Amino acid sequence: MGEGIQRLGAMEEIFGRDRLTEGLRGKVREMIMALAEAELAEVLAAGSYERSEGRLGYRNGKRQRSISTGLGATVIELPRARISAGERDKEWQSGLIARYQRRARSVDQALLGCYLSGANARRIRGALSPLLRGAPLSKSAISRLVGRLEALFTQWRSRSLASEAVVFLYLDAIALRVRIANKVISVPVLVGLGVKEDGQKVILDLELFQSESSSCWEGFFEGLISRGLKRPCVVIIDGNKGLRAAVEKNWPGTAVQRCTVHKLRNLERYAPRHALEEVKTDYHRIVYADSLEQAKKAYRDFISKWNKLAPKVVVSLEEAGEELLTFYRFPKSQWKSLRTTNAIERLNGEFRRRVKTQSSLPDARAAERLLFGLIISGQIQMRRIDGWREIKHVSPLKAA
């Protein structure tokens, strides 16, 4: 507490005394107490010192309570009362302020925001000292907030997906460093991101697995399908073989779009250094063509040109084949959104930016909870895809 007070004093030396906030804080104190008095009067069916035949209880003094609001900590006096409940009376409990509440919801939201940004308890106390104004903030208080987040995550993970009309489905993995069995290792969090008929993106599920093997991706699929997710029009994926096998096993014949950016990275690994730019230019003629017909011609030209000059490059291209061109079968306004898994890559970037202050996460559940918290707290925003107004014209495709 002393540290917080010292920091607050230092801030006042820098910025001067905040008389406006002090005045508003006093008004907030008066307003909270007035609201509590009005709430109690309604419950008792009688105001303070008012005689009434319909009285449902009686007042029993007041008690002091310190509460932190968006304007800082303030001490209020809450009325106490006994309420008639049959043969026995019971103590009145305000619906405005819960029994053990010490902070307004806005302060708890700020606490959670700091936690999700990677701050520990000491840093949180420092960052929020103007709000807390010396009020205690223990590790257990933060743990209770995290516990509420955990409960919400568990509920979210079991929600039905039957009503989610997903047209496009992006599947990819995010690598995080997590401590497992006393060793810090890099593990994938499998992510399913859907695009609904109104163009809005929605995270369908995220789950940490030990690898991106076929069995792990199949387990991820089983979770989605068991919760009611229906087959989408197209699935956008990278080149992971386990993921591709899981798509075919669970939704055989579903159209697949291979990420064109991931494939370019693969081609670059096999391209001769002196020919790298030329390979990229020829590849771009395939994935940035004006039509499917032009793309197919560019594809054939690429193979014809590089088959002898860089055969491994051609083998890599043919591994994906026409699944690189699936997006051309959709409205042109949607091509940019459909040809890559960038929708999840952007999430990956946001996640990494927020966890870079932590060398590793303490366990698997903490990693999942952190990603979930960043999404539901609004710290990560997802916009509609390009060309969403034309989604109504999209119909299921057969595999290329």
Annotate each language-model stretch with its function.
Residues M1-N120, R125-A151, Q155-A165:
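Short, flexible loop/hinge motifs at secondary-structure junctions
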Residues A38, E42-A46, C114-S117, P130-L131, ...:
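Conserved, well-folded catalytic cores of nucleic-acid-processing
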Residues A34, A38, Q109, R122-G126, ...:
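Solvent-exposed alpha-helical segments within well-ordered globular domains of core cellular machineries
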Residues R59-K62, P79-Y100, R133-I237, K241, ...:
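RNase H-like nuclease fold core
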Residues V234-K241, A246-D282:
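Conserved beta-strand -> loop -> alpha-helix junction used to position metal-binding or nucleic-acid-contacting
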Residues M1-M11, F15, R19, E42, ...:
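Acidic/histidine-rich catalytic cores and adjacent linkers
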Residues A36, L40, L71, I83, ...:
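Mobile genetic element proteins and their domesticated derivatives, centered on retroelements
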